[in-house]
């Protein structure tokens, strides 16, 4: 009883739904959490951090694929998802250049050097968060949110 197996890279199961549609749905699903986070923190840097991490992730993917003479895949929205997830994982007081550096690391080192979409060994946004946490521990861990402290309202 011998079977012929065809060994090929993933994905092994295919569907009519394209990965670009799935990534777009993920972006749409993340938008309410993003807007609530920006509103909740009320920090002037929060929306800029989202914009910078997302734009630098898309730009890093575009530049890398152009330099390596690969087909440009920014239309699949995976870089947008990575930039958005990274922004949601970072403290809102983080300098914008660190967010951009994290996005570039996520796209080039964690995603593209391992083969691109679906071939990476870990989530690029979380890999970038680990990189930033190891590289800039003070900025990544020191975040003080102004809170209201005092006795309960019944004590008044």
Region spans (language model):
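Non-transmembrane, aqueous-exposed alpha-helical and coiled segments at domain scale
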Residues: 1-2, 67, 71-75, 93-100, ...
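Cytoplasmic-side transmembrane-helix entry/capping segments in multi-pass membrane proteins
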Residues: 72-82, 98-104, 119-129
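Alpha-helical transmembrane segments in multi-pass membrane proteins
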Residues: 25-33, 49-61, 78-83, 87, ...
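Long hydrophobic alpha-helical segments that form multi-pass transmembrane helix bundles
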Residues: 118-156
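Transmembrane helix interruption/hinge and helix-loop junction motifs
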Residues: 40-46, 90-99
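N-terminal signal-anchor module of multipass membrane proteins
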Residues: 1-58, 62-65
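Charge-biased, low-complexity intrinsically disordered regions
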Residues: 66-67, 71, 85-86, 90, ...
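C-terminal ends of transmembrane helices
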Residues: 10, 59-71, 107-118
